[in-house]
Amino acid sequence: MNAKHRVTSHCDHELGICGISPEANEALPAKKPLEIYTFIDPLCAQCWSMEPILKKLKVEYGHYFRIRVLLAGKLNVWNACEAGKAKYTRPPVWVKGVSSSNMPYAGDIKLSDFHPYKASLAIKAAELQGPKAGHRFLRKLRETLFLQKQNITNEDVLKACANAAGLDVDAFIADLHSPSAAKALQCDVQTTNEMDVDTVPTFVFFNDNSEEAGIKISGQYPFSIYVQLLEDMLGFVPVKATPPTLEGLLQTYGFLATAEVAMVLDLSSEEAEKKLKTLMLQQKVEAVPYEYGTFWKWLM
């Protein structure tokens, strides 16, 4: 979208993106041509650290793609766990990787009592209520793990996450123990193996209008790399949505880290924090500090 077409910031809750005015919607594709397979592990610190980049990609170019979340677990390990009864054996140092990103977290997390199968199964159960419900649940799940240091493989904690994400909690619990969620998770693992995904996070970009193979990228790269991948898959330079205002962004997402605000709005961390503190003085947001960073809760 060039400068002469800029309009007042708008957030489309159906599209799940900001910066698209009703007038500008006419210039956007009616059907999203791309799909991004996002291979993650809900206990993975590096996956959590990707949130600012993914948020910016959705806000600016979300009208071109859908995101499909796949759980890249180890099926042979889960089978040996008898459907999640065995405990997690990765050392706590695995979670210390969050400190290398700007995403806040509450300190080192002991994973020895975690059951990884249960957390992944819960995400598939949430997705049975729709993709948006699944995305909301995944976000709450990560916040509960990395910010509150709770055991997200505990069923009571999972119920609380489902409630906070606006899910039908009774249906969620029923689905958690149903063959449907287990089958969906098995499909994720099968896809993970078929695509030779051996590390998380990994992203595979597909064009629904092309028979060509997708493009796979593992790990974290500068934002410009992901935009270039979108351009390569689309075959043209994608139109960037009008950037949202700070208040519009917070109103849409409700609870954001300083790093997410800074990334989406192209601000330094210091600039973002200054603007957020101004809103705090106006009693529009509440600062929620953690040991390694701050989140901001929209109050209006």
Swiss-Prot record:
Name of one Pfam family that matches: Thioredoxin_5
Location within or outside the cell: Cytoplasm
SUPFAM superfamilies in the record: Thioredoxin-like
Gene Ontology CC terms, in alphabetical order: cytoplasm
CDD domains, sorted: DsbA_FrnE_like
Keywords per UniProt: Cytoplasm
Family that this chain belongs to: Belongs to the SpxH family.
Protein's job: Adapter protein required for efficient degradation of Spx by ClpXP under non-stress conditions. Interaction with Spx stabilizes Spx and exposes the C-terminus of Spx for recognition and proteolysis by ClpXP.
Subunit-structure text: Interacts with Spx.
Protein name, as recorded: ClpXP adapter protein SpxH
This protein's encoding gene: spxH
